[in-house]
Structure formats: structure tokens, C-alpha cells
């Protein structure tokens, strides 16, 4: 199951050239770029591990791409994403976030719906082991 999180998630995975162009777009807007990774891609897990510090004041996406290559070397078996943070007054939030690396076998989730007291509905997400393709 292909995980769909962030921008471009329903498109084919981005190439390094496409990632470079997206990062350059973020830098041209003056956004801080950061790289994060996780082995738990659950949608409610918003706190991924940061790879280094956010990259402020960069002018060229090559610096981000060098850090991405190193992150992939160390954590290539995990999900890696790039985010662009806009610190402009009135925004002050992540403006773009997209996956740039996936593990060889992706996890699957199952949503369990349960009716509880007062006809309230409770949802539980169960993470299943990745399906192995032979």
C-alpha cells in the first residue's frame, strides 16, 4: 500500500531533479527547509525526527540535496520528507511538505470502527505488517 501524505502523494514518486526544483522553489520564497524521517508514518504522528537543524538562509537547493543524500544513506529504510516553513507574519507555518523516500516495504493500516455509549463512534487504527512481495 503506497502511503499518501503531503503534497504530490497521489503522483508517482518525485525524482531527485524534481525534488531539487521543489526545494529551490521553497528557497526562492524565503522558506526554511528541513528534512525529517520516521519509521512510524501514521497520519497522527506529526512529530518526525529531524535530520540536523532547519536550513535557514540557503540560496541553492544543492545544500539540501547533499543533506538528503546523507539522510538516505543512514535512514534509507524509513520514510523521509522535506518541509518548507514560512515564517512570514500571518502564516508562520509549514507551507509545503512531501515525501522523498519510502522504505522498500511499506506498512499498511486498517481502520476499525466501533460504536460505543451514546451512539458515539470510536475509530482505532491498527498497523499491519507490510505485505511481502515475492
UniProtKB/Swiss-Prot annotation:
Classify the source by domain of life: Bacteria
Under HAMAP family, the record lists: RuBisCO_S_bact
- One GO term (biological process): reductive pentose-phosphate cycle
Gene symbol? cbbS
GO MF, one annotated term: ribulose-bisphosphate carboxylase activity
* UniProt protein name: Ribulose bisphosphate carboxylase small subunit
Task: Enumerate the CDD domains for this protein.
Answer: RuBisCO_small
Origin organism is: Bradyrhizobium diazoefficiens (strain JCM 10833 / BCRC 13528 / IAM 13628 / NBRC 14792 / USDA 110)
The miscellaneous comment for this protein is: The basic functional RuBisCO is composed of a large chain homodimer in a 'head-to-tail' conformation. In form I RuBisCO this homodimer is arranged in a barrel-like tetramer with the small subunits forming a tetrameric 'cap' on each end of the 'barrel'.
UniProt keywords (A-Z) are: Calvin cycle, Carbon dioxide fixation
Looking up SMART domains in the UniProt record yields: RuBisCO_small (SM00961)
Q: What task does this protein carry out?
A: RuBisCO catalyzes two reactions: the carboxylation of D-ribulose 1,5-bisphosphate, the primary event in carbon dioxide fixation, as well as the oxidative fragmentation of the pentose substrate. Both reactions occur simultaneously and in competition at the same active site. Although the small subunit is not catalytic it is essential for maximal activity.
Complex and partners: Heterohexadecamer of 8 large and 8 small subunits.
Record keyword Disulfide bond present: no
Q: Which family does it belong to?
A: Belongs to the RuBisCO small chain family.
